């Protein structure tokens, strides 16, 4: 028998190193593991032009922040034209935390709390250059991508993590995309349902 391409190995016991402790990340960085969010079914049109519609598609709310879903729908007929638009969104739909290849006329959006605190996709990343998340001091609010975007037919979809939970009052969401003909458009929502949904969030497994 000829020598095997692969070396011999001894199977490692699964109980030796397969235990995965709860992966805790700073609250500004993303949603917590093993927590069931409270959901707000809120759909709004955030911006529109002849070629493009930007939509808000609900909130999933945790005790420290919330995920919101942004959907971009385009009516470009050509496959290559759609590909160019979605490829741009894939690599750059903001600065810093959301990539540094942002085009000045590209999609940008942001949120503002009733306290006048504001975060936009043009903000620099709060991620510390030295990677020391434990000692990083971050001032909210913060917007960050969560997971990979999804593309299907005429739509691009992505979830975004927003930290912290907004205070009582109004939540403003602004969108602008000059290249696609969307002027700056501001949508105002009541933060109350988001706050109530955050209180409904629960751990999936109570601590033993």
For each predicted feature, which ranges?
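Residue-level recognition of well-ordered beta-strand positions that form the cores
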Residues: 69-73, 110-112, 161, 174-176
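Internal, hydrophobic beta-strand segments that form the core of beta-sheet-rich folds
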Residues: 167-180
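N-terminal onset of structured domains
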Residues: 2-104
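Acidic, serine/threonine- and proline-rich intrinsically disordered appendage/tail regions
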Residues: 194-208
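Extended, solvent-exposed segments with strong compositional bias
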Residues: 103-163
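Short acidic/polar inter-strand loop motif in beta-rich domains
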Residues: 77-78, 118, 177-186
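A short secondary-structure junction signal
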Residues: 81-83, 122-124, 183-187
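Main structured recognition or catalytic cores within long modular proteins involved
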Residues: 173, 190-191
């Amino acid at each position: 028998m000829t020598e095997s391409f692969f070396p011999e190995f001894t199977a490692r016991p699964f109980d030796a190193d397969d235990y995965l402790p709860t992966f805790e990340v700073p609250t500004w960085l993303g949603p917590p593991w093993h927590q069931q969010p409270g959901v707000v079914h809120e759909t709004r049109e955030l911006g529109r032009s002849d070629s493009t519609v930007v939509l808000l598609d609900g909130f999933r709310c945790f005790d420290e922040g919330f995920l919101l879903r942004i959907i971009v729908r385009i009516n470009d007929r050509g496959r290559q034209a759609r590909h160019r638009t979605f490829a741009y969104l894939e690599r750059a739909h903001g600065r810093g935390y959301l990539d540094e290849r942002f085009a000045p006329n590209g999609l940008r959006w942001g949120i503002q709390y009733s306290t006048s605190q504001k975060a936009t996709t043009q903000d620099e990343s709060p991620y510390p250059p030295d990677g020391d998340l434990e000692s990083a001091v971050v001032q909210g609010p913060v917007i960050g991508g969560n997971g990979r975007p999804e593309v299907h037919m005429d739509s691009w979809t992505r979830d975004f993590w927003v930290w912290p939970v907004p205070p009582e009052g109004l939540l403003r969401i602004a969108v602008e995309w000059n290249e696609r003909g969307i002027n700056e458009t501001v949508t105002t929502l009541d933060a109350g349902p988001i706050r109530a949904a955050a209180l409904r969030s629960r751990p999936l497994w109570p601590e033993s």
